[in-house]
Amino acid sequence: MQESGLKPILWTNKELILLDQRVLPGTTSYLKAKTLEDCIFAIREMVVRGAPAIAITGAFGIALYLNGLSSQPTFSQLKTKLDELLESRPTAVNLRLVIEEFFSRFPEADYSSANLEKMQKSAEEFALFMLEEDLENNLTLSKNALSLFPKSPSSLNIITHCNTGALATAGHGTALGVIRSLRDAGHSLTVFADETRPYLQGARLTAWELKEEGIPSYLITDNMAGWVMSSRKIHAVIVGADRIASNGDTANKIGTYPLAIIAKHHGVPFYVAATSKSMDFRIPDGSHIPIEMRKENEVTSFGFLKDATGKPLLNEGVLAPNGIKALNPSFDVTPASLISGIITERGIISPVTEENLRKTFS
């Protein structure tokens, strides 16, 4: 199965090079991250975004932090730094799992027996493993998804939301990876990509990936989804996930929940594509998922994308009256009852129940 040629994360000469997704599609530029603080900035300001890509960037951030030291930090110093990393974006579970995995290698009880050189080597090896593992998992889950669609080449209309492609992962993608794999399997696709307000990941990133791949597509505003489903034959809605609770409730980019409701009304299968890294069996349901609240100006203007000096990256554009208050939750939670199936590298979970999830990931 062919993977995407897009590479948003590169590790070269002990430096992390990130495709700056804030300036796509108009400009292709890269940010060099030389420190953990650079990685935190890149995650918080969405130079890099998408739960898998955030986690991988965090893993390399740990390596950069340790590589920049001449003596081993105390456990308290290390924990403080990694807590700062975790706080950069709290909703996706993937970043937390990276930090917990690193601490499992150097637990507090045995920390005195560790040494800096060993920690540096382990951190870099772990980050590189994460990069490779995510790509393999994306390719596998995309292959698994083919069983949900006709075996013979068919014309398929699919709606997707936000950006879940190579830009959001180590490569290939989750939901958009499924779409790529359907194309590679010979299906004739038309993709309807939600623009995904307010950050416009669908318009700026997914539409760009689809165009680069030559996959026929339409960009639609988020509030057009109902019209599209009522006037066109839609075969599936496929989205990604930032965190999946024990019962299957799924946190994903804001706007996913109403899309699932519309799909349910029209009898359109609604699939979540995610790797096992998005599962969080420590929480019973979606009410326990923390929802990141972002700045109001992301809703009220197009001037919210700024570089490290505060200079706008895009032309300023005011959308609302000065002083108007705005809500800006970055995610919402889709109840498991609205999800037809969860596509993973371990297989497809359907119906979506805690029993089936635990059976798959035990």
From Swiss-Prot:
Record keywords, A-Z: Amino-acid biosynthesis, Isomerase, Methionine biosynthesis
Recorded GO MF terms: S-methyl-5-thioribose-1-phosphate isomerase activity
EC number: 5.3.1.23
Active site: 242 (proton donor)
Catalytic activity: 5-(methylsulfanyl)-alpha-D-ribose 1-phosphate = 5-(methylsulfanyl)-D-ribulose 1-phosphate
Family according to the record: Belongs to the eIF-2B alpha/beta/delta subunits family. MtnA subfamily.
Annotated protein name in UniProt: Methylthioribose-1-phosphate isomerase
Annotated organism of origin: Leptospira borgpetersenii serovar Hardjo-bovis (strain JB197)
